[in-house]
Regions:
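Histidine-centered catalytic micro-motifs
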Residues: 280
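Beta-strand-rich domain onsets/edges
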Residues: 306-307
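Active-site His/acidic residue clusters
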Residues: 284-302
């Protein structure tokens, strides 16, 4: 436990109040919040709290794969602390090997004896001036990836190569992964390489960003390729196919891609084309601004949260288009790349391309994003933060034997109770507020959140984006429910730019928050620039 957290808990125990100020009486509230656990809705897929790793910069090599002979504590070459922390948040899935890397990756290069694997070309490292892995060692292949998934307890999500691969290569990879022992020659080869039992990979991405790095196609052109790749696939495990979707952060939301792809599938009759998931990417993209991940002012704080919140509209827009072609909505959204993307300048080192400082702002952005995903549980099968370690909106930073959790990690930890819960209605009695942006102004919810129920426990998560004002809430459970007890944690810091470093790894960590209960009502004070998670146990 960090000294800061220990001191806080001692203070809270001694005074009976939160360190952010004494609670007002239950009847004196800034916001009335009503939650109705008697009206459970769709289940929140655990997979919306998913992860993404790629052969880029320090993500796989050094971040995760340190090598079997490394002095860094490891399990068969995989960083031990990474495994432990991923287990702690119940990481439900891992997407690999890309990203753009996937459409240049040929899976056979990553199997067999490590010393005999070919050294191959990594286009994305080569095109980066400071990339150090332009020559891909292939030390981390499908067997190492599956070992990582088993250690963590995560389900594999494999992105296949459409951009430079073939349907045959894809089908062989599926067979290599999933064919039972003693059936195909590919199953024998897998066993000879150390894994007799099948990997049982269910989730398969059919390419990645095929509108760009994955082939520079139109939606209609990709529809043709998609049909080829999923035809005559080996079905040892019923696959969940994820088709390449739009670049949702583009100016128009890239709605033309969605229309073109589903329209292209409609032109084919009688082939039974199945699309289980549709991959929407949404980056809160600030690469063209003067600010970076560490240096920002009030306008920069609000601009990132405001643009991040726009993902909700993008989800609704593409869902509506999908519904025109698929009225029953058999195809679900898979938001397999999301997160903040700043201009360079705060990398861990020149070779750690696309790494960036992760601050309290990024933790709140993640919280608001998760609440959007929860509220649209009927639409979203999976989501994957980009990326889990040493890249963009990362949960961890690692360089050699130095390692830390970022503030964003704790958002995942605090939201874990939502996984597999059923969404319940939550009404927050606060209007939106006007906030300054980098250009002009915009509107943000004064308080945003979501709620879920599981057994006799209700989880509510709330984010206060204000840099100035705390919010005192009175939370009432509707439907005749009564509270037995409540427990709450808060993630905040007096400095909006606060981050965790190798030297100060516990600067931004969750702390206990007072949550007094009376009958069907609880009180929470949400500090400024904070995210709160509360669990209410029903009588």
């Amino acid at each position: 436990m960090s000294p800061r957290r220990r001191a806080f808990l001692a203070s809270a125990a001694a005074t009976g109040i939160a360190a952010f100020g004494r609670l007002r009486p239950l009847h004196a509230a800034d916001a009335e919040i009503e939650i109705d656990p008697s009206q459970p809705g769709p289940t929140i897929s655990p997979h919306v709290y998913g992860h993404f790793i790629e052969h880029l910069g320090g993500v796989v090599y050094d971040g995760i794969w340190v090598g079997r002979d490394s002095k860094v504590p490891n399990v068969g070459g995989i960083r031990q602390q990474f495994v432990d922390d991923m287990k702690r948040i119940g990481a439900p899935n891992l997407r690999w090997p890309g990203g753009c890397f996937a459409d240049g990756y040929h899976w056979r290069d990553g199997i067999g004896a490590a010393g005999k694997r070919p050294r191959t070309y990594n286009y994305w490292e080569h095109r980066m001036p400071t990339g150090r892995h332009a020559v891909e060692s292939n030390a981390f292949g499908i067997h190492e990836f599956m070992r990582l998934c088993r250690l963590v307890g995560a389900e594999p999500y494999v992105a296949a190569n459409v951009g430079s691969g073939t349907p045959r290569e894809f089908h062989d990879w599926m067979s290599y992964c999933n064919a039972p022992p003693g059936t195909l020659s590919l199953a024998d080869e897998r066993a000879a390489n150390g894994d007799e039992e099948p990997f049982n990979v269910k989730y398969w991405g059919v390419g990645n960003e095929s509108w760009g790095c994955g082939g520079n196609m139109t939606g209609g052109e990709y529809a043709t390729e998609y049909r080829k790749f999923i035809s005559q696939v080996p079905v040892y495990v019923r696959p969940f196919f994820v088709a390449t979707g739009p670049r949702g952060h583009s100016a128009d939301g890239d709605v033309g891609w969605t229309e073109g792809f589903f329209g292209g599938l409609q032109n084919v009759r009688g082939l039974g084309v199945r699309v289980d998931g549709f991959a929407l990417h949404y980056y809160t993209d600030f690469r063209q601004t003067a600010e970076d991940g560490a240096k920002f002012d009030e306008k920069g704080w609000y601009a990132v949260l405001h643009k991040g919140a726009h993902i909700e509209q993008v989800i609704q827009d593409h869902w509506a288009i999908m519904g025109r072609f698929d009225p029953q909505h058999r195809t679900k959204l898979v938001i397999d790349e999301w997160g903040n993307w700043y201009r360079g300048g705060t990398e861990l080192g020149p070779e750690y391309i696309l790494s960036q400082t992760i601050t309290l702002r990024d933790a709140l952005h993640a919280a608001m994003t998760f609440d959007v995903f929860n509220r649209h549980a009927d639409k979203i099968e999976m989501a994957n933060v980009a990326q889990t370690i040493n890249c963009l909106h990362s949960l961890f930073a690692a360089v050699g034997d130095r390692y830390t959790r970022t503030p964003a990690y704790y958002t995942f930890e605090m939201y874990r109770p939502h996984m597999g819960g059923r969404l319940v209605p939550v009404r927050i009695g606060l209007p939106q507020v006007t906030v300054p942006l980098l250009e002009g102004s915009g509107r943000l919810p004064a308080l945003s959140g979501s709620a879920s129920v599981r057994d006799r426990s209700v989880t509510v998560t709330l984010t206060n984006p204000s840099l100035r004002e705390s919010v005192v809430t009175r939370i009432r459970l509707a439907g005749g429910a009564r509270l037995r007890e409540a427990r709450a944690t808060v993630l905040t810091h007096p400095d909006m730019r606060a981050t965790n470093t190798f030297e100060k790894p516990d600067e931004v960590v969750p702390m206990a928050l007072a949550a007094p209960v009376s009958g069907d009502t609880a009180a929470l004070t949400i500090p400024r620039q904070a995210v709160v998670a509360a669990s209410f146990h029903l009588a």
